[in-house]
Amino acid sequence: MASFLMVLALPHVRQIERATLPNGIRIVTESMPYVRSVSLGVWIGAGSRIERGPENGLSHFLEHMVFKGTKNRSAEDIAKSVDSVGGGLDAFTSKELVSFNTKVMDEHLPLALDILAELVLNPLLREEDLAKEKGVILEEIKMEADQPEFVLHETFISNFWKGHGLGKPILGTRETVKKFGHDMLRDFHARVYSPSNILITAAGNLDHEELVRMIGDKFAGLAAREPLAVDSVPKTHAPLILKKKESLEQVHITMGVPAYRLAHELRYPLYILNTVLGGGMSSRLFQNIREKQGLAYAVYSELNLFSDTGCFSVYAGTAAETAKQVVSSVIHEFRELKQELISEDELRRAKDHLKGSLMLSLESTSSRMSNLARQELYFDKFMTMDDMLESIERVERDEVQAIAQAFFRTEDIALAMLGKLGDMEVTREDLVC
């Protein structure tokens, strides 16, 4: 936002417009005439979810490779182009998306679009860059393997959505990355970076019609293709996995259950439940496990929600001798949320927390740009700030309890533990709630 006064004057008004190019590329913009920046993003429906077996990690690998040079820009030119105007250029890969995005002053929007178009449409993907980038990615995989929380997360997710793309690592594995070839990379780019699989969003001081014209000039030559096949809804599993690593000082614990998809109509009561359980310093997990019992430094709950499924999980790191006590404490909180309504005070705090987080999350052009993509891809409609705030305010205590009762079922709880476990055992009876 341009200033605090502007936030007060235009709290919930969003000037959002949509367009679709003849080849199928979707464009969504939000005009914010009271700012001087523009954030622009190109979103590809890729990630581990759409990768075939040997391709695991290829979305992320390709995201790296496009920065090695394009038809009209070297790797150094790409870096200098945005740096020289004080802007930022970034990219990331998730389970369901790849994003290339930039933020610049409004007068540099043509430059920003030109760079993103080059990255997406004209990467060189040279064979000589392949081996070097494999080395980079393999080191990234090794780095992640040295982080217990990451190892635990991958262990949990790979078993929770076993056999499905959502359960595969975004980076791929050492085995898959080593086998990536030049033809595989080019074929994947041609198949996945297709018009029906591309969304472009922008927010800031921009003119919608002019930007659509500019995007058309850059992307109109990309031929339409058949949409990618939609994969199946993943089946969830509830294993109990204890993975020994004697070199660790702590035992790391993740417990999780299936949750709603991102656009589910009951997502707001679910957000409240997550906030009450482990969404902050005043949450039950933080207060009871850290503050009252002193069993953990890090303890929280989180939601990982996707287009057709989700996971509601709890993480804690604790000493080996208190690991089972932490598991019991988490189960106790599950049980309490099922048996008793949350207090009016908890409900009020959770609502205010969500409202504040929502308002703060939409202050910048970059966050607005990302929000446009999220709403277009997952909700297929645009909700006003008032819509979202009112949805939060409408949540009742019995709705939160009903979700706890539906989700926190003993037979559905998956568990993964990593650390100095000795002869520790955890059975399904330990998870009765």
Question: How should each PLM-predicted stretch be described?
Answer:
Residues 1-10:
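N-terminal amphipathic/basic-hydrophobic helices that include classical n-h-c signal peptides
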Residues 34, 39-103, 279-295, 306:
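M16/MPP (pitrilysin/insulinase) zinc-metallopeptidase core fold and M16-derived inactive scaffolds
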Residues 53, 57, 111, 132, ...:
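A generic structural signal for residues located within well-ordered alpha-helices
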Residues 240:
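Flexible, small-/acidic-enriched active-site or ligand-binding loops
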